[in-house]
Design a protein with these regions (language model features):
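Charged, well-structured alpha/beta interaction segments
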Residues: 46-53, 57-71
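Short glycine-rich loop/turn motifs that provide flexible caps or phosphate-binding loops at active sites
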Residues: 11, 54, 58, 123, ...
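Metal-dependent phosphoesterase signature
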Residues: 11-31, 56-65, 77-80, 87-97
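Generic enzyme active-site microenvironment
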Residues: 7-9, 50, 123, 159
Length: 187
């Protein structure tokens, strides 16, 4: 059976934005991330990271540095709270189905983990994160951390930070689904 998921951008969403972060010592996870991820897991959501990493393609950081930062992020938030992490090293302007705003990384995760995209969310700080979610057919939440305060976009929801975004997902997931049956009038 398909399960709902939450796809998270990494930099500026789960952790403080550090331009082309290649140093694990610079990883600063936002408050509420660990507890929020735990709550999502308890509610039955899969959780994924989807991150553009053009710094690799530009030669500014190595894949090994990226993985060291990812390992530090995992250590700070807690093991087992993220199902999988996907990244795209392609530079802007390079034809790519994986680089956000293209939804390739979301579709990869959906195929690998049998994700119910109609019940899923994309959370990120940038307009490209929101556009990626829309192209994938998931609900979108823009956080005002990272670049979020500078980029107004057509997200389904705009919230202060990832903790509030997770609260929004959990609240919305408890709402009854809209009825698809038509009602007869009593004329």
């Amino acid at each position: 059976m398909s399960t709902p998921a939450v796809f998270f951008d990494r930099d500026g969403t789960l952790m403080e934005e550090v331009h082309y972060c290649g140093d694990p010592a610079k990883v600063r996870v936002y408050a509420g991330v660990s507890a929020g991820l735990r709550r999502l897991r308890e509610a039955g959501f899969r959780t994924f990271i989807v991150s553009n990493q053009a710094g690799i393609g530009r030669g500014l950081i190595t894949e090994q540095q990226y993985r060291a930062v990812e390992a530090e992020l995992t250590a700070q938030i807690g093991e087992g709270l993220i199902d999988a992490s996907y990244f795209c090293p392609d530079m802007p302007g390079t034809p790519s189905t994986r680089r956000k705003p293209e939804p390739g990384m979301l579709f990869e995760a959906a195929a690998e983990f049998d994700v119910d995209m109609a019940a899923s969310y994309m959370i990120g700080d940038k307009a490209i994160d929101v556009e990626c979610g829309k192209r994938a057919g998931v609900k979108t939440i823009q956080v005002l951390t990272g670049y979020g305060a500078e980029q107004d976009c057509a997200a389904d929801f705009r919230v202060k930070d990832v903790a509030e975004a997770i609260d929004t997902v959990l609240y919305r997931s408890r709402l009854p689904a809209p009825s698809t049956t038509s009602r007869k009038s009593n004329k």
